[in-house]
């Protein structure tokens, strides 16, 4: 478990009050997922040993896909990886354009010391490692040509690490960032770091200093990602883990965008093995993986990652990792862990009022309120539970055993659908023509 600070604890409870998955500290109440977490640790070990790989997290609404993806990234950072968490959106992220995907990956790039927008820090660490290596080999860091030797090593190392596949503009920008920082021109160096991260709003004057025009294109972005990956490792990190959350959003896109997005996932899966030290995690619903509107409609991808299950048994090691819904024992365990973590003014009152009998009653009422299937709405349970912790903490005479009665809050369409048991698969999905197999980057 990572070291918990008071700031982390406050972040956890503020997020849960709003129905959100916390971005850190979640390993403190990760209960009942040891086997799935162990498989993701195995994937991290593969990446650390130099493998490139991709894993799909499969689960219905409320199964904890986002939680598991964020937990995997937290574990990855604790093991020395850089990470990035990207949410698929039909408004903000056009998944069929890899320059969009690359830009979001770079914006969300983080490490244990720099949680977001970490490319500048990673570059500094890599350049520092090069300077230290040159000094260790006998070079004089005060010599007039020392910076030129660093610049040449940047070029040589990028060519060696990427097998010559890093675009020349990528190399020139990295070298120019180094030059500008040595000159004290932090503003233009920062602008070029933004360009390297996929920004399309960098001034022409800054780009001119690196001898580049235009922006990173969709067809170039995969090669840029290869360069970034190698710099991440050269900076001392074990590798890079990228989580793509809510891939089922692709199902709501226009047909042409949906087809291109599915082919984009296929291209990522096809290329994954050649990106040594990179682990992709992609979350999605069974509908996304199993219908002809989704992965099942694109035969080359479906054949590679099709979910295999015999009765109630499924291997954790196959391409799709199945996440199971919450059950009553798991809810009780999570509630007890949250009670332990809660930053109460009077911990004894919390333990006395939010008792084991009250937790058991709340779990039972929630389960009954949702037709015996609490697994579809853990968000509601956790919000209700944290609210009871707050009520006891704030009001000395409040007793939840006598004052509180569970009433389901307004449900989202996804929750209504999950509880009703209605199939999400539409006639259109069943009649969907096969997705054309094409390279779109």
Can you describe what each PLM-predicted range is?
Residues 1-53, 146-147, 399-441:
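A short, basic N-terminal segment
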Residues 5-8, 189-354:
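The catalytic "switch" region of P-loop NTPases
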Residues 8, 32, 36, 53, ...:
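Helical mechanochemical/support elements of P-loop NTPase systems and associated helical scaffolds
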Residues 39, 71-75, 97-108, 260-264, ...:
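Alpha-helical scaffold elements adjacent to nucleotide-binding pockets in ATP/GTP-utilizing enzyme cores
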Residues 54-59, 63, 67-235, 393-397, ...:
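P-loop NTPase nucleotide-binding core
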Residues 61-66, 248-249, 377:
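Gly/Ser/Thr-rich loops at beta-strand to alpha-helix junctions
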Residues 67, 131-134, 250-254, 408-418:
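Eukaryote-specific, cytoplasm-facing alpha-helical/coiled-coil scaffolding segments in long proteins
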Residues 176-194, 311-314, 324-441:
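C-terminal alpha-helical "lid" subdomain
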């Amino acid at each position: 478990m990572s070291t918990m600070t008071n700031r982390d604890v406050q972040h956890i409870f503020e997020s849960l009050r709003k129905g959100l998955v916390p971005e850190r500290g979640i390993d403190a109440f990760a209960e009942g997922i040891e086997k799935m977490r162990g498989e993701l640790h195995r994937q991290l070990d593969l990446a650390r040993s130099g493998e490139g790989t991709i894993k799909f997290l499969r689960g219905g609404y409320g199964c904890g896909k986002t939680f598991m993806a964020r937990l995997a990234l937290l574990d990855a950072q604790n093991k020395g990886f850089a990470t990035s968490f990207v949410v698929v959106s039909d408004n903000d992220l056009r998944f069929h354009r890899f320059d969009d995907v690359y830009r979001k990956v770079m914006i969300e790039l983080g490490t244990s010391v720099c949680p977001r927008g970490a490319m500048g820090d990673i570059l500094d660490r890599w350049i520092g490692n090069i300077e230290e290596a040159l000094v260790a080999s006998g070079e004089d860091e005060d010599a007039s040509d020392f910076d030129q030797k660093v610049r040449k090593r940047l070029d040589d190392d990028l060519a060696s690490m990427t097998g010559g596949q890093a675009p020349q503009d990528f190399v020139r920008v990295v070298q120019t960032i180094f030059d500008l920082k040595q000159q004290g021109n932090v503003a233009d160096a920062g602008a070029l770091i933004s360009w390297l991260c996929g920004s399309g709003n960098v001034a022409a004057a800054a780009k001119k200093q690196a001898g580049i025009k235009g922006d990173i294109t969709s067809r170039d972005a995969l090669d840029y990602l290869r360069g970034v990956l190698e710099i991440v490792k050269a900076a001392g990190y074990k590798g890079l883990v990228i989580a793509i959350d809510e891939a089922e959003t692709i199902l709501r896109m226009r047909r042409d965008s949906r087809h291109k997005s599915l082919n984009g996932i296929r291209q990522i899966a096809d290329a994954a093995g050649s990106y040594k030290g990179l682990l992709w995690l992609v979350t999605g619903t069974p509908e996304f993986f199993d219908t002809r509107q989704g992965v099942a409609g694109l035969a080359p991808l479906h054949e590679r990652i099709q979910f295999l299950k015999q009765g109630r048994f499924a291997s954790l090691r196959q391409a799709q990792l199945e996440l199971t819904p919450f059950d009553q024992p798991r809810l009780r365990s999570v509630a007890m862990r949250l009670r332990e973590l809660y930053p109460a003014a009077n911990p004894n009152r919390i333990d006395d009022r939010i008792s084991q009998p009250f937790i058991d009653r709340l779990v039972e009422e929630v389960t009954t309120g949702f037709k015996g299937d609490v697994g579809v709405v853990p968000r509601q349970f956790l919000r209700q539970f944290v609210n009871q912790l707050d009520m006891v903490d704030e009001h000395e005479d409040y007793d939840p055993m006598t004052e509180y009665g569970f009433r389901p809050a307004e449900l989202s369409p996804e929750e209504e659908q999950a509880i009703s048991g209605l199939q999400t698969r539409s006639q259109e999905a069943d009649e969907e023509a096969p997705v054309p197999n094409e390279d779109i980057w």
